[in-house]
Curated annotation (Swiss-Prot):
Location of region: Disordered: 1-106, 214-243
Function, as annotated: Component of the eukaryotic translation initiation factor 3 (eIF-3) complex, which is required for several steps in the initiation of protein synthesis. The eIF-3 complex associates with the 40S ribosome and facilitates the recruitment of eIF-1, eIF-1A, eIF-2:GTP:methionyl-tRNAi and eIF-5 to form the 43S pre-initiation complex (43S PIC). The eIF-3 complex stimulates mRNA recruitment to the 43S PIC and scanning of the mRNA for AUG recognition.
Protein name: Eukaryotic translation initiation factor 3 subunit J
Family to which the UniProt record says this protein belongs: Belongs to the eIF-3 subunit J family.
Length: 256
């Protein structure tokens, strides 16, 4: 009985230790089960990589607005720098205008030319600053849109300018206006160029004088009447009056 009991105990122990691992049994062996879990771990790693890709895309999307903001800052800085330069230029022009004149260095004509030039620069600077401040469009048409550089360009520019100016030729102030205009625009010219312009105006003046003389001569010819004209007619009238007077005097002498 004891031997039987011992045999049963050994068999129970054997049965206890011979029980197979259900996990390994289901997995089809230790090695296969381990590979399966390792595969699942790799899937989890791939999922983590996908998250990393999403994070990188988000970071790129966040970086782009920062680039745009920096570009806007650069543009704003450029505008501010340009405004500072314009302001500095205006101050320099204003300072030069307020400086006392130096007659020992510049002639009166040169002083006038310098003042006109500085005034023009200041006006242009003020205009450009106003346009930039208020966002005015620089699109212009006609004579204001021209920027002549060649001979043909200046010829066309001259025609448009002539048409613009001569529309006021009926004004009482037109001649004085032209005199001042020609003097002002010729101040910066060289002597040789001034001589050419003077000669051209002299020739024009001579032609106008000839035309005026011819016109007066034609008017005189139209007023002449055949047979002595107006003077002859007056002479005849006086003769008739004298004949009448002579007859009256003869009658008086006969009466005496």
């Amino acid at each position: 009985m004891a031997a039987a009991a011992a045999g049963d105990s050994d068999s129970w122990d054997a049965d206890t230790f011979s029980v197979e691992d259900p996990v390994r049994k289901v997995g089809g062996g230790g090695t296969a089960g381990g590979d399966r879990w390792e595969g699942e771990d790799e899937d989890e790693d791939v999922k983590d990589n996908w998250d990393d890709d999403d994070d990188e895309k988000k970071e790129e999307a966040e970086v782009k607005p920062e680039v745009k903001i920096s570009e806007k800052k650069k543009i704003a800085e450029k505008i501010k720098e340009k405004e500072r330069q314009q302001k500095k230029r205006q101050e320099e022009i204003k300072k030069r205008l307020e400086e006392p004149e130096e007659p020992k260095v510049l002639t009166p004509e040169e002083q006038l030319a310098d003042k006109l030039r500085l005034k023009k620069l200041q006006e242009e600077s003020d205009l450009e600053l106003a346009k930039e401040t208020f966002g005015v469009n620089n699109t212009v048409y006609g004579i204001d849109a021209m920027n002549p550089s060649s001979r043909d360009d200046f010829t066309e520019f001259g025609k448009l300018l002539k048409d613009k100016i001569t529309q006021y030729e009926k004004s009482l102030y037109y001649a004085n206006f032209l005199e001042a205009l020609v003097r002002d625009v010729c101040i910066s010219l060289e002597i040789d160029d001034l001589k050419k312009i003077t000669n051209s105006l002299t020739v024009l003046c001579s032609e106008k004088q000839k035309q005026e003389k011819q016109s007066k001569a034609k008017k005189k010819k139209k007023g002449v009447v055949p047979g002595g004209g107006l003077k002859a007619t007056m002479k005849d009238d006086l003769a008739d009056y004298g004949g009448y007077d002579g007859g009256y005097a003869q009658d008086y002498e006969d009466f005496m």
